[in-house]
Amino acid sequence: MEALALAQGKPPTAANIRSVAEAVSPEDAAWAFTQWELRERARAKFPDAERMLFTREALEQATPAAIARYHASMFPHGALVADLTAGIGGDLMALAERGPVVAFESDEERAVYAEWNAGLPARRDDAMAAEWQWEYAFCDPSRRRAGRRLSEPEDFSPNPVEVARRMSGLRLGGIKLSPMLSDAFLRNLGDSIEFVSHRGECVEALIWIGTEAKPGRYAVQIAAGGAVSRLDASQTLPARRDAAAFVFDADPSAVRAHALGALCAEHGLHPLADSVGYLTGEQAAASPWLRGYRVLADAPARERAVREAARRLAARVAEVKSRVPDTQRFGWVARVVEGERRVTAVLYPRERSVRVLLAEPLDAGR
């Protein structure tokens, strides 16, 4: 770790790298400067990133600390949990906070880093080839190979279909996957599916399997501080309608989980025309699941019509939100300036046409 100490706080210039290399070795110097670069990038995921070790690829897939704590919270306190894919230890650290863990990581470098980061031993063998002597397990199949993101689940390591089959005999097993995978594929793995959002993005799909899994489909929102909110996706959507006094952009996990019916029922909202993810209603609604806007104008997506609406408001478009395909063809919307009042342009589909709302965020000025 001498190289890390020597490289700390120094920009990775040729002179600095050469200076550190003279004290250790060129390989150790390059490794140390890479670690400090990765530690800086990892700060968004891990509060204690400055003490951790990373590989570039493993950091990309590593679970942020707030989400890892949610994963760990699903397992009983004090029960043994197997981390089948420890990586550099993102989930392993959170699992260890709540009880005993057995960790598997077949990649030697990642296993060493996981041990450093979590302070626990990691078995170097393949978890899928081991005899399972636990009732709880978590798996985050690798979705990258040689720096390339894999899109086909059968290429993941381990194969999530095989993991789900093995987990069916447990009390509870969790599999972390991409939220971009199809509903049909996810349903084939298990009956309890969660779509998780963090910092405004839907970041993962979680499949829970076993006798303690709660069947259903859910949206889960994890705040930066770790607070957790859940929506049940069992409620149906009400009838669609045109724009009312307010429009709301729903959290992406609620959209992906098909859980907008719960938000409509709670706040008296309706889907906006033919959009997926925009809701509308006559009253303002306060919810961590919704970002609200006061509708000022509703115009067809033609430049003359939108500019005329903006002129009546003496407004300029400061932000563009869109849930229509091929948004780039409406690039002119961002250049609409007909005054100083800052508004948000919301593009949405209605039947075969596209319309533009000019609206003000309800949280503007806070």
Regions found by a protein language model. Give the residues of each.
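SAM-dependent transferase fold signal centered on methyltransferase-like domains
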Residues: 1-366
